């Protein structure tokens, strides 16, 4: 007999999604799903965008369930008024079995084109490729790839433009990157994208051992294992430098790691920073200003920014 879980659904303004999702992940110990929202690795183009988003979390039916429900209600009451358009509603509660919980979220993920050549395709979806398409097959797992912001998309767009010498990157570097460092690899999608675009040696690190396992499965699925090396090695312990460094993490972490990230960029190399709220652009730029990197481009989508920097040849 399948185990029964409780699904708790909260409808909140879009700007509150990240805060609520982080709280629910910590409270439940499981991933969350977000409806009516553009996801970071797949498209919801069949769902009309809405200023209100539904965040769902999943809890085991046990003695702690009532306390968890109270905690969610208290969190909404305490934090919701800080966000425009918030109206308190009691979370909707539904019972679902384990099989439904494990698979229900997949219906929101569809293939999506990013840039001119990259296409991210969930493993369970069919897709008819066009000539020149580079297909990234991904199974992010319940806790990966279901975030609510376009930081990964912008990173991939910048990645493609660097490798193809397009847009702001045209004529900046004479050759495409050969070596890549992916800091906070998560599902591994950025490393896979770099491999598909032609990188020859990619080092992908994450402090979360579970993320490294999932990334390894996705790398193998895309037949990139001979190019991508995954580990939980701390950034500070890595040696050498790279033609391209990618870091899709929070602004505060980017600034904290600024010196370590900057020193990993080879001359004539790029540093792409994402996971940045637009209001923190200057905070991040100031954090990296001592290290001699030139601003090439800032991409913006919604409330998020992606910054690309370049280290002039010595």
Swiss-Prot record:
A GO cellular component annotation in the UniProt record: cytoplasm
Domain of life: Bacteria
Main location (coarse class): cytoplasm
InterPro entries, per the entry: Ribosomal_L11_MeTrfase_PrmA, Ribosomal_PrmA_MeTrfase, SAM-dependent_MTases_sf
Subcellular compartments: Cytoplasm
EC number(s) per entry: 2.1.1.-
The entry's keywords: Cytoplasm, Methyltransferase, S-adenosyl-L-methionine, Transferase
Region forming the signal peptide: none
CDD domains: AdoMet_MTases (cd02440)
Annotated NCBIfam families: prmA
General function of this protein: Methylates ribosomal protein L11.
UniProt protein name: Ribosomal protein L11 methyltransferase
Upper lineage: Bacteria, Pseudomonadati, Thermodesulfobacteriota, Desulfuromonadia, Geobacterales
